[in-house]
Structure formats: structure tokens, C-alpha cells
Amino acid sequence: MWNAQQDSDSAEALGRRQRWFCAGTLVLAFTGTFIIGFLFGWFIKPSNDSTSSVSYPGMKKAFLQELKAENIKKFLYNFTRTPHLAGTQHNFELAKQIHAQWKEFGLDLVELSDYDVLLSYPNKTHPNYISIINEDGNEIFKTSLAELSPPGYENISDVVPPYSAFSPQGTPEGDLVYVNYARTEDFFKLERVMKINCSGKIVIARYGQVFRGNKVKNAQLAGAKGIILYSDPADYFVPGVKSYPDGWNLPGGGVQRGNVLNLNGAGDPLTPGYPANEYAYRHEFTEAVGLPSIPVHPIGYDDAQKLLEHMGGSAPPDSSWKGGLKVPYNVGPGFAGNFSKQKVKLHIHSYNKVTRIYNVIGTLKGAVEPDRYVILGGHRDAWVFGGIDPQSGAAVVHEIVRTFGTLKKKGWRPRRTILFASWDAEEFGLLGSTEWAEEHSRLLQERGVAYINADSSIEGNYTLRVDCTPLMHSLVYNLTKELPSPDEGFEGKSLYDSWKEKSPSTEFIGMPRISKLGSGNDFEVFFQRLGIASGRARYTKNWKNNKVSSYPLYHSVYETYELVEKFYDPTFKYHLTVAQVRGAMVFELANSIVLPFDCQSYAVALKKHAETIYNISMNHPQEMKAYMISFDSLFSAVNNFTDVASKFNQRLQDLDKSNPILLRILNDQLMYLERAFIDPLGLPGRPFYRHIIYAPSSHNKYAGESFPGIYDALFDINNKVDTSKAWREVKRQISIAAFTVQAAAETLREVD
């Protein structure tokens, strides 16, 4: 079954004794290369003599042509034969397979990097479920214990049943309250408008709109003693499409798994801020960071129908609270009529366990700047088969590694070092990437150029979707103009053309939409904590016509290879396009003589964000005046940044690229700009989110928020206990933001 990985001699040999950046690796990969290469190659030879772009002018074209859709298809098939739950033998075996294949592909160094982190598993002998009990305490209904197996997978026995990872154990019972999506505003509606108290109740919420961990946190704050999560057809069933296996919709018994943590970037709950290695100090389980305090369990919509059909109490406040089930969506509390004495009971027996996980880290050393790292990473662990999440991304990473290895075997090397990562335990709170970044944080802060995330390659087949730092906007726009669009009706046109038409920006007329980085994926620690420029790209659905959350079969047993091959991307042309985008981003970042970062795009973004947060504040004009709140300092800092960025850009245009010292100075200014937005003290209550310009929303981890410190200070400010103190905090956050932008501008000034 899903037994946690046991320590073994082979695990030790491949794992802890091969920790990445160990002394031997440093000597092999960096000490000799850096000292000799820097002294002789950097100062004696012109910097562009040894770059691949000069030696092999067609290498970028060769790289893109070498990427093959059929290889991605083959890799995806291979990666989805068995489940790969973090901490299990299957996932360890896949790590060893990737380790061996990356070596065969030709990387200079491939190692396993292991950590002992807190994971969560269901109890095999005491399954989790939800029941309805009558007044005598007898069960009259219980939810399904497992999903039906998809065709062709009936004989695979190690499928973990649906559960909410890190839910505490417990058997709470009580009246049921329907809380819509369990968002902050939903609980405000219940408590402030409808006067419904959730304290001591069991609440049921539909998946969607916000991260499930935020739902659980909101339920806790409302006093609930348990929460049930379900996938409503309105959010996970597209009209006109059949359910799996005949289509890509969610069957009634399909269930979304997922963690319900609120880590806020802490990493392993027992070692927040520090790597979970062999000598790490670990908190007691009772002191673990980010764990929920109330039992949680997910169910499918067939079971949800049974729980909701006899709900009594208040009618839903408006149509936005109604889903796609044939129930009235009454809020409760409790059942109606003859069912009024029945209660709902959770039976949760999951357990937490310190378990070993394994990242795979591959290195392709740079020829000119081996001490500058461009990182491509995506996770490998899956809740079950992971047909989309994550293996559609892992297969693309595998093909990109193979392609870079092919070029290397022909004598090519990138200018800068490229690191490739197959992360473990992403589904349990981004643990693999966070622990590795924590272990190597000092090196990464000094040498990290960029991080490109490579989770799911598709969540639809409509158009490109990009989230990234403004530093990468121009890079993405330029490279998509060079790539062909895979979309029907855009034959002979560029990816940029189809992207711009299908997903236009709401902020910048005539440009495609690029979104802010939030969280919920492995770029978090690199961007939000370390300040390394980051980006991600994948193919997505038509969000205008398709209102479902994510894709319907997300984190269910039905996320199979066949789902992708039959319904989403039969020819794998969209996977290939995503490989080209991700690969080209890495290629440009690792190979361009001048880093392809655009600080002027950052200036434009800062101006937009400052205007947006100011407009939000002006919802309170009287208070702004009474408490003498001014945004003048922030707007002044943004104007200064804009002026300095313009002058910096002019120096880039005039740069003598044959002068290695000047080249290094300007590249370092570009590389460290993102770092300049990092506040070591972090955001209020979220010390591991340190980026002052961007952070995950406090109310939805998946979404990005600009000037998050100011935004959070303003949120629901009229209902704060101490209004005067709340407005002083707004003033403080404005000053922090203004200082940070001004300080960042200073890093771009010409070095005297």
C-alpha cells in the first residue's frame, strides 16, 4: 500500500551521503572551475569568446528543434504507470530512475538530495469517512471510502484513498452548516449579514476559488469543529462533456486530495526556516507550524448530495451560493423537518510521520560564469498517477534535460550553470524545494540568476498562461514571438499572436496577459523568500467560457495518462509548446551575454500597483484624511525608480560587451534587483514571505497580491477592534513599501 519509505542501505548510499553541494561537489563543480575560469577565462579572454552563442550561432534554434513531442509523450506514459505519493517506495524508485537517466543524458553531475520531513497518511486499518447519525447515535449513511478505479488500473493496489493531508484525528459531530466556498467573505456573510454562528458546528464547503488550506483556516477562525470539502458540479463539471472515462469531467465519486496546511512559506512544519537534515532541531509534533486544528475530509459530489439534500435553516443568501446539485443549498444549521435530529459526524484517523524524501538535482556547468545559476525545477510526487499534476510537467523537464544533454555531447556548454531539479513532496507543502533552498540559501542568494517552475504543463488546451516577475515580461514576449502557435486557426502565426488574441492583458492594451506570482508551487521559496527572479508557463483553458476551478479531475484517481492522451493533447503539441517556452527561457537566461531582464518593465508594474493600492485606500477617504495617510512617499519612490531604470537601460544599450568587468557589474545589478525587494523581517505574521512587492494573498494562497503589506493592513479595516492602531499600521506599511522601492532604485544607479 502507501507505506512510507523505510530507510535502507541503498537509500543512504544514494541519499544522505550524496547531499548536493557537499564538499566533493564543491571541489568538482565550483572551486576549480571558478578560480581557474575566473582568473584566466574572465580577465584574460574577451567574455564572448567562449560563449556558445558565438561558437554555435544556431544553438538556440538547434535546441528548440531537438525538443520532440513524441519523447514527452513517452516520458509521460512511463511516469504514470504507478502512483508516486511522496515518501513511498514508488516515488523513491522514480527518483532513482530519473537520477540514472539524467546521467545518461550527459549532465555533469546528478545527485539525490534527501530530507526527513513531516508527512501525513491515512490509516489503512481505520479508514476516514463521514456519516449521518440518528438520534440514537446509529449510522444511517456513510461516505465512500475510495474512488472506483479507472479502466486499466483495477489491479493497482497502492492507490491512497481520498484524504486531507495533515488533518488532525478526531470524531466531531454536530449540526451541518453550508458555507459556500469558505472564503473570508463567505464567513462575513454568514456572521454579519445572516447572523449564523458556526461555532461548534460541522461546516461543508465546496472546493474552488481559494486554496483549501485557507478554507480550513477560515472555518477554524469561525469556531467550527470540523470541515467537509467537496467538488460541486458547478465548479468541476463542464456542461456538455461526459465524465471520465468517456470525457474529462469529474464523476460523482471522484474526489480531490490535497494538503490543508497554512505554512506561509515555512517549509517542513517541524523545521521552519531551516533544512530538515540529519542534525536539524525538530519541534515536537504539538509545536508543528501550519497544521490545522480541526478534522478535515474531502468527498465527491454524489456523497455531498446526501449531506446537503435535507439541509434546513436559512435559504442561500443569493444565487452565487448555489451550485450544480439538485439541492436547495440551504445554509442550515442542521437538517430540516423529519431529519432535524440527525447529526453529521467525521471519522478521521490519519497520522503524521517524519519520512524521508528525495530531490534529484542535475548540474550542467557554465563555460564562462559557472558561479551563476539558472534553475529549472518541477515536482515528481503525485497524489495518485499524476497524469497532469505533476507528470505532464515532469515529462517536459525530462525532455529539456535530454535536449541540453544532447547539445553538451556535441561540445556546447551554456554561458552560466544550469541546475535541474525534480522536487519531492510538493503536494505536502512544497517541502522538497523549500528544504533544498533552505540548505543552500546562502549560495542561492549570492549566485541565483533565475528560477523557472515546471509543474503541470497543461490545465487546458486553449492558450498560453504565464505568471512571472516583471523582470521577465520582455523575455517572455520576445521569445513567444519566435515560436509557432500550436492553436487551430493560427497556422503560420506566432505563439505571441494567439496568446495576445485569446488572453489580452486588462492592464496593458495590445499585450498578452501576464499574471502576478502567488504561491502553491515550488517557485515560492525562490521568489518570496530569497528574491530570485522567477516565472512559470503552461497551457490553460478558456477562462471566459469555462468557469470550472482548475481542471475537473485535479488530484483525483482519474488523472491518468489516458486523460491527457485522449482528451487534452492527443498529439502532445501543447506539451511541446510549453517545453519550448520553458526551455527557451532557461536557454536565454543561461546564455545571453547580458541578462534578459527588463527593469523598465518593473518600473511600469510598480506604477500600476501603486495606483491600484492607492485606489483601494480611497474607499476610506474620511479616514485617510483623519489619520493623515499619504501615499506621496510611495509615488515619489516609484518615480525615482522609473527614472533610474531608464538611465540604467540606456547604459545597457551603450555597454561595451567586450569589457568583462563592466559586463559583470551590470549583470549583477540586474540579477540582484529582485533581491532588493526582499525585507529580511518579512510581512506581518508571515515572516517567510519577504517580498514587499508581491506575496500570496492572505485570503487565497494561490493568488498573487501586490504591495501585500499595505493591502492586508487595509483589508476589512472598518471592523478592526482598534481602528486608530489599524490606520497606523497602514501608514507603517506605506513607509516600508516606499523605502523598499527607493532602496531598490539605488541598486540600479551607476557605480562610480
UniProtKB/Swiss-Prot annotation:
Residues 45-752 are extracellular. Its EC number is 3.4.17.21. The NAALADase activity is found in the central region, the dipeptidyl peptidase IV type activity in the C-terminal. It catalyses: Release of an unsubstituted, C-terminal glutamyl residue, typically from Ac-Asp-Glu or folylpoly-gamma-glutamates. Widely expressed throughout brain regions with highest levels in the hippocampus, dentate gyrus, priform cortex, choroid plexus of ventricles, pineal gland, anterior lobe of the pituitary gland and supraoptic nucleus. High levels also found in the cerebral cortex, substantia nigra, pontine nucleus and the granule cell layer of cerebellum. Highly expressed in astrocytes and non-myelinating Schwann cells. Also expressed in kidney, localizing to the proximal brush border of the renal tube. The lineage of its organism: Eukaryota, Metazoa, Chordata, Craniata, Vertebrata. This is Glutamate carboxypeptidase 2. Keywords: Calcium, Carboxypeptidase, Cell membrane, Dipeptidase, Glycoprotein, Hydrolase, Membrane, Metal-binding, Metalloprotease, Multifunctional enzyme, Phosphoprotein, Protease, Signal-anchor, Transmembrane, Transmembrane helix, Zinc. It comes from the Eukaryota. Has both folate hydrolase and N-acetylated-alpha-linked-acidic dipeptidase (NAALADase) activity. Has a preference for tri-alpha-glutamate peptides. In the intestine, required for the uptake of folate. In the brain, modulates excitatory neurotransmission through the hydrolysis of the neuropeptide, N-aceylaspartylglutamate (NAAG), thereby releasing glutamate. Also exhibits a dipeptidyl-peptidase IV type activity. In vitro, cleaves Gly-Pro-AMC.
